[in-house]
């Protein structure tokens, strides 16, 4: 199985199912960041828009409302699990100018010159061949079409992810991803993203560095948040099941010690650092 197929399997099965289960939590965490990226996304009523790696559809719906019924938005994701949830979400809201499909943005054919603009909230970091993927997006954009996306900066600058993981890695073998390999932090390096976009044909590339405190595990006690993290994080969930009770308790106590300063009024409040990138065809 190649790395792109592995990502599809991961996001359709283990990670996708957990994401759908925790959809409210994930959207609460990511929506403020997505909203900032959308504020940089120059779309107007009547445009046709592509939402890349749309997940469970929250940004797709936001875009659909902004372009009104004159335009439409296509939400594409290679996770069937998440697309099914996105369809339910949009139908519940009665959104008409929207369509969802299971598509591999890297490898599946997209309609040529179909879209005025493309957007992604943390959905473009998982390609095994990013230049191939971004060229495919490029082909789907009309002349002077715009692409805007948000992605994480370095793992070390995002303690919401890194702080607990560093503790877990002391007790469980969590494979370290190779530099720039598919994953949440694939585009931490600004020059790497710039080279991908340039080699894919884009112009007028702009970067915005965005720092924002984000909420995790809203409504939970600190202890419940740690338990949820330990039991539900896809990259080590299976290995955690076979870990001894003593080691699990050590992990719990060490994470509690590190996370306590971030706990504020029934949620964890962590700093985050992202890139928002804008460019044109």
What feature does the model see in each segment?
Residues 131, 142, 146-218:
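Conserved catalytic/acceptor-binding region of the Class I
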Residues 4-8, 15-22, 206-266:
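C-terminal helical/coil "lid" or tail adjacent to the Rossmann-like core of SAM-dependent
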Residues 1-47, 58-62, 82-85, 89, ...:
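Conserved class I S-adenosyl-L-methionine
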Residues 48-108, 132:
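Class I SAM-dependent methyltransferase SAM/SAH-binding core
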Residues 116-131, 153:
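A short SAM/SAH-binding and catalytic strip from SAM-dependent methyltransferases
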Residues 106-118:
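A short acidic, Gly/Pro-enriched loop at the edge of an enzyme's catalytic core
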Residues 200-203, 226, 273-281:
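Core SAM-dependent methyltransferase catalytic element
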Residues 68, 127-128, 141-143:
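Helix-to-beta-strand junctions that scaffold the AdoMet/dcAdoMet cofactor pocket
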């Amino acid at each position: 199985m190649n790395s792109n197929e592995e990502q599809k399997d991961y996001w359709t099965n283990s990670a996708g199912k957990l994401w759908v289960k925790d959809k409210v939590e994930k959207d609460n965490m990511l929506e403020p960041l997505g909203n900032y990226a959308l504020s940089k996304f120059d779309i107007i009523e009547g445009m046709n828009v592509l939402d890349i790696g749309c997940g469970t559809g929250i940004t797709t719906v936001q875009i659909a409302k902004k372009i009104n019924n004159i335009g439409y938005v296509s939400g594409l994701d290679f996770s069937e699990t998440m697309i099914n949830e996105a369809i339910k979400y949009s139908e519940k809201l009665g959104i008409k100018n929207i369509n969802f499909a299971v598509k591999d943005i890297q490898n599946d054919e997209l309609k040529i010159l179909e879209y005025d603009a493309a957007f992604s909230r943390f959905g473009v970091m998982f390609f095994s061949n990013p230049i191939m993927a971004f060229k495919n997006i490029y082909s789907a954009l009309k002349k002077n079409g715009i692409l805007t996306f948000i992605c994480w900066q370095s793992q070390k600058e995002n303690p919401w992810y890194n702080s607990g993981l560093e503790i877990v890695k002391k007790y469980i073998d969590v494979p370290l991803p190779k530099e720039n390999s598919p994953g949440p932090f694939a585009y931490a390096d600004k020059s790497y993203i710039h080279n991908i976009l340039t080699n894919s044909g884009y112009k007028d590339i702009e970067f915005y560095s965005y720092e924002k405190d984000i909420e995790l595990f809203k409504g939970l006690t600190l202890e419940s948040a740690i338990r949820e993290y330990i039991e539900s994080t896809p990259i080590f969930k299976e290995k955690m099941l076979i870990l001894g009770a003593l080691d699990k308790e050590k992990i719990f106590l060490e994470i509690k010690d590190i996370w306590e300063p971030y706990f504020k009024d029934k949620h964890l409040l962590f700093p985050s650092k992202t890139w928002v990138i804008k460019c044109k065809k």
